[in-house]
Amino acid sequence: MLSTPLRRRAVGAIAIAAGAAIALSACSAPAADADSSSDAATATSLTDFGTLADLETAAEAEGALNVIALPRDWANYGEVLDAFTKKYPDIAITEQSPDVSSAEEIEAAKTNAGLDTAPDVFDLGLTVALANTDVFAPYKVATWDDIPDALKESNGLFVGDYGGYMSIGYDSSKFAAPEALDDLLGADYKGAVAINGDPTQAGAAFAAVGLSTVQSDGTLDDFQPGIDFFSKLQKAGNMLKVDVTTATVASGETPVVFDWDYLNAAHTADNPDWKVVILPGTGYAGYYNQAINKEAPHPAAARLWQEFLYSDEAQNLWLKGGARPVRAEAMSAAGTIDEKLFSALPAAPEETVVPTEEQSTAAGELLGTEWAAAVQ
């Protein structure tokens, strides 16, 4: 197992903060301040509620949950959301702004602070999570011990949830499979190569630069070789600056795409000619992270959502979407993982890198100063 329409998820998936504020509702009412809500807002584990049934009761009393930046075709989130609704029909989920970046998730929380429209929970790239721990409430789910230490903040401020490998998807009716990164610099790929977002804000795009770095004989201590590759791609006229969505892939508008393997693989449902390749050599892996808004308007529902996401049921639903759930190793040992789906995942590269917190932070700073000029 590894040591998160397509949204432009912000930076790092274990691999900056920026983005416009999002006014989700201009006339929203302030969130209610009941004693029970206050108790839920300070709960750091299931023990603070008593039992799961007690947490369920508290969440159902709130009756609502605000999620943000969860496209239904991203890692099978549609089925995850529907499963939660089926299990808890008295909790109405509001799916806010599914295509925004993680940086914009944080801006939405700040813009809507104190309102019942504020997001209750986040799904974030590591760099944005690291930069915004003051926005999060610590919480350790019941399955906390199953989660590798390297993939969780020690107090539960943010926790890895699902991950994958950076890949290249392409329309095989128009292009040959790239066998090496530099193949994409050739004339055959003129105006065709897109990344999923802006790497200063979006995790998948950040990872594309990371992959390009290690494929260019660099290391994750310095993303400059990856930035240089995309500068060459731009100068060759091959870089396509179009936001990648399911629709752009299906229509052929974005025919070659750097993205997570589970997202690229999902496009085969809409385009039978769509193929996915993980380049030989060093691979790049990453996870997204869950966090709870410390000012969540529905704090009990936020914590119940976390408990659900780290249950066997939801972890297997992410697996169904082609992502690698963070509890996969523990579930495999316990016999609770869907072995058919688990064994069907693409083979991992022989050598895989995952950026540390320090490397992610340094890369984010470098991209912030160098990226825009490099791809002009």
Where are these regions (language model features)?
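Sec-dependent bacterial lipoprotein signal peptides
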Residues: M1-S25
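Bacterial lipoprotein signal-peptidase II cleavage site
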Residues: L24-S37
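Short, polar/charged alpha-helical segment
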Residues: F49-E60, L70-A92
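Extracytoplasmic ligand-binding site segments that recognize negatively charged/polar headgroups
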Residues: N66-D82, T94-K110, D116-E253
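A ligand-binding cleft/hinge motif common to bilobed small-molecule-binding domains
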Residues: T127-T133, A250, P255-W274
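Periplasmic-binding protein-like
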Residues: G163-S167, I227-K232, N238, N271-K294, ...
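Mature extracytoplasmic/periplasmic domains
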Residues: Y284, Y288, I292-T352
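Extracellular/periplasmic bilobal clamshell ligand-binding domains
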Residues: G335-Q376
